[in-house]
Structure formats: C-alpha cells, structure tokens
A protein has these predicted regions:
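Ligand-binding pockets and gating/stacking loops
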Residues: 1-163
Length: 163
C-alpha cells in the first residue's frame, strides 16, 4: 500500500490500485490527520496491542482459507500499514516541528500536506501522493494559476530541497 494525502478523505481505498489488485491500494489521509481509529488508545499498552494484532492475524489466516486471496490480502496489507503508522503517529503532528521548518512550507493546507508527505517518505513509505484542488481553471487559466502558484511554489520547492 501507499499513502495518499488528499483533502476530505480517509481510510483504506483498495480500489485505487487498479489492475495491481487491492493488496496495493492506498491508505487515504485527509486534512493532514491520521485516519480515525489509527492511533493506539492511551489506555492500551503496546504489549496488549501486539497481542491483539497477533490474534487478528490468526483470525485472518483462518478466514482467508478457501476465500478469494485479493480481498483478504488487501485487508492484511492495510492492517500492516496501519500497524507501522501507529508506531509513527508523530509524523502527522507538524506542530512540534521548529517554526522555521514549518514556515518554509507555508501555513496553508498544501504546505502542511507536503510537509507530512516528506516526513512519511523519510520514514520509509515508498510512495506518497499529495492532491491539490483548483487547478482545472478552464476559462481564466492565467489569472487562476497566478493565484494558485504561490501556494504551490513555496512548499514544493522546500520539499524538493529537503529530499
């Protein structure tokens, strides 16, 4: 699975992988926040969480026996990615970064999303897609893009420089 940072989305999208199959579907992260339920509750210890995941894996193996492998593999891949992200929830909290680093990316949503994408890539996520809306301006392209470019230029340049 890969990660998509897309406004107004969240959860696992198995259909996004097309002919590759649901195992390679995207984990959708919307509005720069973790998908609901991804973070381990404070009252659940890491050991108890690991035991719970081991039990889930056992149930998954039993469930998968005799069923179509694509869907069960997709669920298993989504849970594995979620387990890895649970260990790295701090990646999504850009508020704790130095102000100078945040300022390089700007204070708007696209800047935050690109900063999160950079942090995910640095943490080992192999593919991150960031979506930005409003570029399909049709009639007034030059003026429309003139207002969009500053929001894109600054964070994209910072991300390229950092990578």
């Amino acid at each position: 699975p890969y990660v998509v940072v897309k406004p107004m989305s969240g959860g696992f999208n198995a259909a996004d992988a097309g002919f590759l199959g649901p195992k390679y579907g995207a984990l959708m992260i919307g509005d720069g926040k973790l998908p609901p339920g991804l973070a381990r509750p404070d009252d659940l210890s890491a050991a108890d969480d690991a035991d719970r995941n081991d039990l889930r894996k056992l149930a998954d193996r039993r469930y998968a026996a005799g069923r179509r492998p694509g869907n069960t593999e997709a669920n298993a891949a989504a849970f594995e990615m979620a387990a890895q992200l649970q260990k790295n929830v701090a990646l999504f909290d850009v508020s704790k970064l130095p102000p100078a680093e945040r300022d390089r990316y700007g204070t708007h949503d696209l800047g935050r999303d690109l900063l999160i994408a950079r942090r995910l890539l640095e943490a080992g996520v192999t593919f991150v897609k960031v979506t930005s809306y409003g570029w399909d301006t049709h009639g007034d392209n030059f003026n429309g893009h003139a207002s969009l470019m500053p929001k894109f230029d600054r964070p994209f340049a910072a991300m390229i420089q950092d990578l």
